[in-house]
Amino acid sequence: MGDDEARSWIRGDETAKQMLSRVLKDRAFLLIPPLHRVPLRAGNVVEITGASTSAKTQILIQAAISCILPKTWNGIHYGGLGKLVLFLDLDCRFDVLRLSQMLKHRLLQANWLGNGAWWQLEESNVKSCKSAEEKTKTVFDEELYASCMKRFLYVRCYDSLELLSSLKTLHYRIQQQEACGSQVGVLMIDSIGAFHWTDRLSSSLALETHNRKSLSLTNVVETIVQELKKLLLVHSLVVLATKGTIYEEKYPANENNRKVSSNDHFSGNVASKAQQPPFREFMPSSWQAFVTHKIIIRKSADYQSLQTGQQNLLAYSLEWLQPQLSRIDRFIVDDVRKLTTIKPFYSKLLLIYIVIPASSSHAVWYCHCLVT
């Protein structure tokens, strides 16, 4: 090996000046409600815990749309980050069509008013087009839609080995996207505990065969955490991971025992007194130490009080466990299939808008925060 080859081999990937310019330009950013209480920085790992059908994937989709949307486009403010989203689907139930429909509605929302204040939209403006397809043709920006969808990288994994393989190739995929001018922003995992039981069974079978080379459940998770740490060292991104719950009480005792008035309880000005998480932790300690922020979502015990008109809306409560905040956010999820007038749901915390096209097979939800 000659001197030139040796120098090229030990040459760093970037200079100290390049490294500082890359790190210092990454500022904290806020996601849309209900993930807006804590500013997130590159390197943060947010764990969103909740039972099945607790709108965890819905929250990820809304956060992904806010990430892939640009801040402005042709003079219209969209309020996005304009960054790349990496979505690892471990549940294998992600519906790309729902992402597409929600993105189109988000674009229409901004185009209708041009300033994002779409709750001021009148009923006559909503019914100016006969169908959702006509709205898409008349107001929809296909070029912007295509550029946003290109920033969404979707990977489906069926077991832990495929997850490890995908994590090892993500660095190369990110480099390809960055070469095209797209900077990575968020890595989403839905959900991190999807393979827990299969890996646990495989570990038991490996112990019976006395095969030392077989990976145990703990070793698999440790390897996954190591690969994620490598990505965080090289790329400036935030990790959002959902996790299901097991052996969780329907309405935890710590929530029912809060001695507050009904007004204070609804406004969210209450503090959680529980020091332990209200669910059974099943992930290994390596993952628990890797997580920097923790959120739990529950079905609200007083969901029957959250009604608009004749519709019983599903209500959920979102609580920050790490860092522990004294405020509990509440949001609603609607599943209306017919075209309705845009009607906001007012509370002291969140303002939820529902826009459902008549031809859509999926519900579309948007959340906007009121000044409190």
UniProtKB/Swiss-Prot annotation:
Q: Which UniProt keywords apply?
A: DNA damage, DNA recombination, DNA repair, DNA-binding, Nucleus
Give the main localization category: nucleus
Question: InterPro entries, alphabetically?
Answer: P-loop_NTPase (IPR027417), RecA_ATP-bd (IPR020588), XRCC2 (IPR030547)
* Cellular component annotations (GO), alphabetically ordered: Rad51B-Rad51C-Rad51D-XRCC2 complex; replication fork
Q: Give its localization.
A: Nucleus
Give GO terms for biological process.
Answer: double-strand break repair via homologous recombination; reciprocal meiotic recombination
What's one GO MF term for it?
ATP binding
- Please report which protein family the annotation says this sequence is part of: Belongs to the RecA family. RAD51 subfamily.
Q: Which PANTHER family match?
A: DNA REPAIR PROTEIN XRCC2 (PTHR46644:SF2)
Q: What does this protein do?
A: Involved in the homologous recombination repair (HRR) pathway of double-stranded DNA, thought to repair chromosomal fragmentation, translocations and deletions.
- This chain's protein is named DNA repair protein XRCC2 homolog
Per the UniProt record, the source organism is Arabidopsis thaliana (Mouse-ear cress)
Q: Which gene encodes it?
A: XRCC2
